[in-house]
Amino acid sequence: MNYNFNWTVIEKNIVPMLEGLGFGLLMAIIAITVGTIIGLLLAFAAVSKSKIARKLVQIFVTIFRNTPILILVYITYFGMPTIGINIPKVPSFVITLALYSSAYMEEVFRAGLEAIPKGIIEAGQAIGLSGTVIKIEIELPIMMKKVLPSMGNYLISLFKDTSIASAITVGELTYISKVLTTQTFRVFEVW
């Protein structure tokens, strides 16, 4: 079988492909930003003294980490309208991705918080700092240094997860590539 590559398909469609790439990156950045904030709050709740808070975080993290993201996307996009909540496809996907990422970020941040030596926290308490000041001024900077590599790795993984948006016809790179493949029959060049 002889296959003749035709790279003009890419040349003619580079703009929509780059737009899809940019849109996927934008969705990933929004989701990781929101997910990081929620994950940080969940991590502080996970290491708090409140048993109820710890248990609620554990349930949330267990559900979101153990459910495939495609199922979560389908529940958000197709399931929510059955109970009267209609969310457009892009916000639906970004919300799902943000909650999904917050469960993973919570684990990263919790590990970072647990790696902080207790003596540093006790030193802050000894000089009269409040619990909030200790968390913001002492724990947060130390933890961020420890978790930054994991966060970078997860951002890359989350960007790859944006391809799942094509399942609900969000126009990111994977969806645009599928459309181009259907229109041009140039599978190898597009992918």
Regions found by a protein language model. Name each.
Residues 1-191:
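Transmembrane alpha-helices and adjacent helix-loop boundaries
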